[in-house]
Structures are given as C-alpha cells and as structure tokens.
C-alpha cells in the first residue's frame, strides 16, 4: 500500500514540468512568409533563365566539339543567385577533393631508417 501514494507522487512530479509549458493555440497563428515584390520575382526568374541558357549553350558547345573532356575546366558558370562559380569536370574535381583531404591529414616525420616503430612512437 505504501507504493501507491509513492507512485502517484512520482507521476505528478514527472508530469509537472510538462504542464508548466504554455500551450498556444496553433489554429489562430498562421505561418507568415516574407512576400517578395513582383519586380524581385521577375528579376530572379530572369536570372535563372539566363543561367540555364548559358549552361545549355556550354553543354551544346562541348558536345559539338566531340567530347566532354575538351571543355574548359575553369569556365565560370552563373548560379541562379547571381554569383559565379567555377565549373569543375572529371579529374579536376578529384584533385580538388584530394587537396582538401590532404590538408586535414597530419604530416608525420620520418625517423631515418629506424625500423623499430610502434604506432606513432619510434625508438
């Protein structure tokens, strides 16, 4: 019988923090997104069209040359947000990735011809 009041007190004690949070009626509040003006929307659409047309021209141009490997790897392509980025193709993206990974690795010193090494400790 002693366990029933103890369990009730424990339950109320654990439930109390949950009841202390305010509950707001989410039906009254609506999600309000920022409204862009029509001019801003038109400019964004025009920029996206320009970027798509330029990438299409580059793609068609590289196919006309014969292979995708002959494309200029440092060609700048506009993004829909208006910034320019360098287009990397094939092997160039692998070299960039390997350079980034090489920076994070620790360079270990060579201890001459000492063959007696355990993990990173050499005698």
From Swiss-Prot:
Xref: InterPro entries: Urotensin_II
Parts of the chain that traverse the membrane: none
GO molecular function: hormone activity
Swiss-Prot/TrEMBL keywords: Cleavage on pair of basic residues, Disulfide bond, Hormone, Secreted, Signal
An annotated GO BP: positive regulation of fibroblast proliferation
Expression sites (tissue/organ): Brain specific.
Disulfide bonds: 117-122
Annotated signal peptide: 1-20
UniProt family annotation: Belongs to the urotensin-2 family.
Protein task: Highly potent vasoconstrictor.
Protein name: Urotensin-2
Organism: Rattus norvegicus (Rat)
């Amino acid at each position: 019988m002693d366990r029933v009041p103890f369990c009730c007190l424990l339950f109320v004690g654990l439930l109390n923090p949950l009841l202390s949070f305010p509950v707001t009626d989410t039906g009254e509040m609506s999600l309000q997104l920022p409204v862009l003006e029509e001019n801003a929307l038109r400019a964004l659409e025009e920029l996206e069209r320009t970027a798509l047309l330029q990438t299409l021209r580059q793609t068609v141009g590289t196919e006309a040359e014969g292979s995708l490997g002959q494309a200029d790897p440092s060609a700048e392509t506009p993004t829909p947000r208006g910034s320019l980025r360098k287009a990397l193709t094939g092997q160039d993206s692998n070299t960039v990735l390997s350079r980034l990974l090489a920076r994070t690795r620790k360079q270990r010193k060579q201890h001459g011809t000492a063959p007696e090494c355990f993990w990173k400790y050499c005698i």
